[in-house]
Structures are given as C-alpha cells and as structure tokens.
C-alpha cells in the first residue's frame, strides 16, 4: 500500500503522542478500546461475534502471529500443512520450531483452492496446524462460504487447527468474509487480520488474532515474553481506523481498480 491512512487515525496518533501518559509501557493484551474496536469491526463487516476481553489479541502487525502461533502450538517433529504457492513465512516459522512441513498444492484448475480429495489421501497423523490465506497471496484467489465451510469441516474431523491469514479481505472486494463466521469455527480455527492493506497502514504494524479464549491465552503466554506492549498512540489510532465507513473502502478500491486498468 502506498496511499495515506485515514486522517482520523493520524490525528489520534499525534494527539496521543503529544499528551501525557502515552509513552509508558503498555499492557500485553492491548487497550480495552482497541480490543473493542476490533470486535466491533468483526461484527460490522464479517458478522462475527467476538468477546473483546478474551477472543482478540492485538499484535505488532499480524506477521508476528505466525511465529507466536508456531511457538505456542508446535513441538519439534510436529507436522504443518503449508500452501504452495504461499507466503514464505509460514514455512520459515515452522522451520524455526523444527516442525515438519507438508506442502499442499494450490492449482489453477481448482481455483487456487486446496484439493480436499488430495488432502484426505495424505498421512495427516501428527499434523497440528494448517495455514490458509484467503484472499490468497500470491494468486489473488478469493474465499467463499463454501471454501471456509470445507476448511472448518476438515479441521474438525482431523483435529487440525486451521490458521487463516486474512489481511486482504477488503482489497478489490465488496463482500469481506471471515472463516470465523462459519458454525463451529472457533472449535478449530483462528484468524489473523491487519490494518496494513485495508487501511494503508503497513508501516504502523497493527494487527490482531481472533480465536477461542483458550487459544488466545496460549498465544499470549509467548507474546508476553517477546515484547512489552504496543505504543499507546498506535492503539488509539487503530480505534479510529477501524471505525471507517464504507466510503473509505470504496475509495481505496476505486483507486486500485483504476491502476489495474492501466
């Protein structure tokens, strides 16, 4: 993203940074205001109800969650399903914790979706995590209710945690979807999200993970040993960014559509 963030976010950042109390250590779990803003955002755009106190963890960008999740839920020798093609960090983080990587192909003739028949034929013993990323990078393939329902069913039947990386859901898309909107998804799924793409705030490093409270608790055990909380002015800026009206996304996507034609 090379556009400007929402003006309200920049104003909130500057106001908080100039005031007293904005430069101290912050809580690992994030401000109540930012957790509520993420919960409201999910309810408004994805139709997903989340407990802001227990089912949301703000992050220094969603990328850090890939390593946090790997450290929290993988032991040496555990297996991880990683898409090919896919975001390299899924494999890199798995290697750091000495997990065994099992790649699954995303093919054009399947719409760049997983081939569930092929997955069922794999030896899935010892598989703890499956990384998914829709809308997909690098293929651009979109998600659908059908795809997410299949992923939830696959994860529940095989005892695999489906980790859906969802930072592109607003880009060139008027109907953002979340895997957590599927019935029973919290039993086996978590989702990463971010302000980087949808709000032109990539350098600000503001993201989140949403999941069942027990999953969030395990992630927090690792995160609390890796940083000392997010800068308060950034969190207050995120609250403003997350409250943007549909016009913000319409203008953002109009610009991307204009560039795509060129």
Give the residues covered by each predicted segment:
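Conserved PLP-anchoring active-site segment centered on the Schiff-base-forming lysine
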Residues: 72-94
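A short helix->loop->beta-strand "cap" motif at the edges of active sites that frequently abuts
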Residues: 78, 99, 154-161, 185-187
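Short acidic capping loops at alpha-helix termini that bridge into adjacent secondary structure
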Residues: 49-56, 76-79, 126, 186-189
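A short helix-loop-beta submotif of the ANL/AMP-binding
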Residues: 96-102
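PLP-dependent aminotransferase class I/II
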Residues: 4-7, 188-262
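Active-site phosphate-binding strand-loop segment of PLP-dependent enzymes
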Residues: 102, 106-177
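N-terminal small-domain helix-loop-helix segment of the aminotransferase-like
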Residues: 1-61, 68, 241-244
């Amino acid at each position: 993203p090379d556009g400007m963030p929402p003006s309200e976010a920049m104003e909130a950042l500057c106001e908080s940074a100039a005031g007293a109390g904005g430069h101290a250590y912050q809580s690992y779990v994030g401000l109540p205001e930012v957790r509520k803003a993420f919960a409201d955002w999910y309810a408004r755009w994805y139709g997903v109800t989340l407990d802001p106190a227990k089912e949301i963890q703000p992050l220094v960008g969603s990328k850090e969650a890939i390593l946090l999740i790997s450290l929290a839920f993988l032991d040496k020798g555990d297996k991880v399903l990683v898409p090919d093609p896919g975001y390299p960090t899924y494999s890199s983080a798995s290697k750091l914790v000495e997990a065994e990587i099992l790649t699954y192909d995303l093919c054009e003739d399947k719409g760049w979706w997983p081939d569930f028949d092929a997955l069922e034929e794999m030896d899935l013993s010892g598989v703890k995590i499956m990384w998914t990323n829709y809308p997909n990078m690098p293929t651009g393939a979109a998600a659908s209710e059908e795809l997410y329902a299949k992923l939830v069913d696959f994860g529940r039947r095989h005892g695999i945690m489906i980790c859906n990386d969802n930072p592109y859901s607003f880009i060139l898309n008027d109907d953002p979807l979340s895997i957590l909107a599927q019935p029973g998804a919290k039993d086996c799924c978590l989702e990463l999200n971010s302000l980087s793409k949808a709000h032109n705030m990539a350098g600000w490093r503001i993201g989140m993970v949403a999941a069942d409270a027990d999953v969030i608790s395990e992630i927090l055990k690792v995160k609390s040993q890796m940083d000392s909380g997010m800068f308060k002015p950034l969190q207050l800026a995120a609250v403003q960014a997350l409250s943007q009206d549909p016009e913000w996304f319409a203008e953002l996507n109009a610009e991307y559509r204009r560039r795509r034609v060129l």
